[in-house]
Amino acid sequence: MRLHCLLIASVLLLSASASLADGDAKAGAQVFKKCQACHTATEPVNKVGPSLMGVVGRPVASVATYSYSPAMKAFSEGGKVWDEALLRQYLPSPQFLVKGTRMTFPGLRSSKDLDDIIAYLKNPAAAQ
C-alpha cells in the first residue's frame, strides 16, 4: 500500500512538472511586449537591457557586448545558467532575486505568463 501511494505521488509530481513547462509561445510573444522596450528576443542586439535571443540555457551575464550591473555580475558567479527554474525565480521579482539590478521591471506574477514567456524565449520562431 505504501509503495502504491508513493508511485501515485510520483506520477502526479511528474505530471505537474511537465505541465509547468508547457507554455504557449504565441501567448508568450504577447507577454514579451512588456519587455520589448528594453530587450529583443529575435536579434542579437542590445537595447537598454541585453539581447534575450538564446537566453534559455545561456550563462547569466554572458552577453559580451552588454555592460551588466555589478549586482548581476555578482549574481552570475558560480556558473549560474538561465534555465527554466532560474527564470521562474527571477521573472516574478527581478529586484528581489538580484538586489541592485538595473532592471526596473516589477515582474510577472501570473504562472501562465511565466510558462508562456519561457516558451517564447526558448523558441521565438514558434510564435509565428
Question: Could you tell me what each predicted segment is?
Answer:
Residues M1-L7:
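Bacterial N-terminal signal peptides that target proteins for export
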Residues G23-V81, Q89-T101, N123-Q128:
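Periplasmic/extracellular electron-transfer cofactor-ligation site
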Residues A16-S17:
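N-terminal signal peptide c-region/cleavage motif recognized by signal peptidases
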Residues A25, E84, S110-S111:
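Alpha-helix N-capping/helix-start residues
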Residues P106-S111, D116-P124:
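Short, exposed beta-strand-loop hairpins at the edges of beta-sheets
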